[in-house]
Design a protein with these regions (language model features):
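Acidic, low-complexity intrinsically disordered segments
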Residues: 1-196
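Radical SAM enzyme core and accessory elements
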Residues: 1-8, 14-15, 34-40, 53-56, ...
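Cofactor-binding loop segments of dinucleotide-utilizing enzymes, especially the Rossmann-like FAD-
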Residues: 8, 43, 89, 205, ...
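Flexible glycine/acidic-rich beta-alpha junction loops that bind and position SAM and/or redox cofactors
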Residues: 12-13, 95-97, 211, 269-274, ...
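Acidic-and-aromatic substrate-binding clefts and catalytic sites of carbohydrate-active enzymes
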Residues: 46-48, 208-213, 237-243, 306-310, ...
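Conserved beta-strand positions in the central sheet of alpha/beta enzyme cores
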Residues: 59, 106, 171, 201, ...
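Structural recognition of alpha->loop->beta junctions
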Residues: 97-116, 250-259, 316-330
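Radical SAM [4Fe-4S] cluster-binding motif and immediate context
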Residues: 141-299, 315, 319
């Protein structure tokens, strides 16, 4: 039996980060049945292989921005007689939609469902739906690092799942649950040591949690022995906690160079509308400065154009970047299926816009301010983004990276920002080419139109 595991192409080009589901699902497969031949495909790196792909079973992992190309790949493979299983957050949220393009859909986490999928396929009794449980994380296999080729330089390690925060825009809590589930620290160290190369990404939704700072310190202390450099996603609330400085010192000693922070909104009103104010803490600018004081570079991710935002928020974004000396990466607000934000924005959605537009580069809903038309929101988004990612600004930021991280953190700053800059330029060209068609869809408004595809 031959299995192909596929990650559909990203909207705006290739990334040096290996999609973690590929090598991890390969490890789950190898543990269940070592006789299965496995091939991995990241479609962003190998877009032209699917016409001639030969396998018995294809597994495709879907996010909302990759759902449409993922469905196209699935439809083409099924037309050639290849059985297709789909999973991931998008398929789990909309299983009936996904089933129209697949022989089976895995809803939820893979660990408990995937062995049953493989056994049923080999027995010729593949079921239409499989439901994975939110189980404990004390027996996860080490991903088959290195099985995926084609120049993916960074691997991702996960140490936890779940999130207690109630940010309205986020899919993590609906998919992984509100309880924080932690992996054994020695298992995390084992996976880090197995990664090829000397740098990796911690892919957790949050690398440090309020109330679990001691666990973060223990993890960072254990990782110090790997002598590898890393970056990860972290919230701001724990930074100013009583143990925050000790935690940051341990993180820096463990090789941490950069933290990606969900700034979420430029305005306080926007933060509260997203229910994200608890996550960022009471003094987020001081928290960012504290991170930098500990030698950790900071990249902020935030959204523009929500129904709570104003035109001034676009202009203020560049000021925040200059004032804090950080890189900033905006997107337009996306009400993903299954989120609370989706429910809130349902009456205002431009429902003619299918999932291919859910990339963070299009206005997807009506705005209460007549001045915030879809075209204005998009134009100002690109104006702001291209300014924040201008080559001069990228280079200037590199010289603001804490000196204690030289040279790795400075090289990493370029490796982080240059692919994003390239992707934004691709997005800008796509946007210009599609403007007329998108305006027609947006003009139909949020009522009386077809449901999003």
């Amino acid at each position: 039996m031959k299995l192909c595991i596929i990650k559909p192409p990203l909207p705006f080009g290739w990334t040096p980060v290996a999609p973690p589901i590929l090598e991890y699902l390969a490890a789950l497969t190898r543990r269940e049945d070592p006789s299965i031949e496995i091939e991995l495909y990241s479609a962003s790196a190998t877009p032209d292989v699917f016409d001639d792909l030969q396998c018995d079973l294809a597994a495709i992992s879907l996010l909302t921005p990759t759902a449409v190309p993922g469905y196209r790949i699935a439809d083409a493979l099924r037309a050639r007689g290849i059985k297709v299983v789909v999973g991931g957050i998008h398929a789990s949220t909309l299983p009936e939609e996904a089933k129209a393009h697949a022989d089976a859909v895995v809803i939820g986490e893979a660990e408990s469902a995937w062995p049953e999928v493989l056994r049923d396929f080999k027995a010729g009794r593949l079921q239409p739906f499989y439901r994975g449980e939110q189980g404990e994380l004390d027996d996860l296999p080490t991903p088959l690092y290195g099985l995926l080729k084609h120049g993916h330089d960074f691997r991702i390690v996960n140490t936890s799942r779940g999130c207690p925060y109630r940010c309205t825009f986020c899919s993590v809590r609906p998919y992984f649950g509100s309880r924080i589930r932690l992996r054994p620290i020695d298992h995390v160290v084992r996976d880090v040591e197995a990664i090829p190369g000397n740098m990796y990404i911690n892919g957790d939704e949050n690398i440090w949690w309020l109330g679990k700072v001691d666990r973060a310190i223990d993890l960072f202390s254990a990782l110090r022995g790997s002598k590898k450099k890393w970056m990860g996603f972290g919230s701001l609330a724990p930074i100013l906690s009583p143990e925050g400085s000790r935690m940051l010192a341990a993180a820096r000693r463990s090789g941490m160079l950069t933290v990606w922070v969900g700034w979420e909104s430029i305005s306080e009103d926007g933060l509260q509308a997203y229910s994200a104010d608890r996550k960022v803490g009471e003094d987020r600018e001081r928290a960012v400065k504290t991170l930098k004081d500990h030698g950790i570079d900071v990249s902020l991710f935030f959204m523009l154009g929500s129904r709570a935002d104003s035109l001034e928020d676009y202009k203020r974004a560049v000021d925040v970047a200059d004032r804090l000396g950080v890189s900033m990466h905006p997107s337009l607000t996306v009400p993903y299926p299954g989120t609370e934000l989706r429910s809130q924005y349902e009456p205002y959605l431009f429902k003619e816009l299918g999932w291919e537009y859910y990339t963070g580069a299009y206005a997807l809903f009506d705005h209460p301010d007549p001045a915030m038309t879809p075209e204005v929101r998009e134009e100002m988004f690109y104006e702001t983004s291209l300014e924040l990612l201008s080559l001069g600004r990228v280079l200037r930021h590199m010289f603001k990276v804490p000196a204690s991280g030289f040279p790795h953190a400075h090289i990493l700053s370029l490796m982080n920002q240059l692919p994003v800059r390239k992707g934004m330029k691709i997005a800008f060209e796509k946007w210009k080419a599609s403007k007329a068609a998108v305006r027609q869809k947006q003009a139909l408004g949020g009522s009386g139109s077809l449901p999003a595809r």
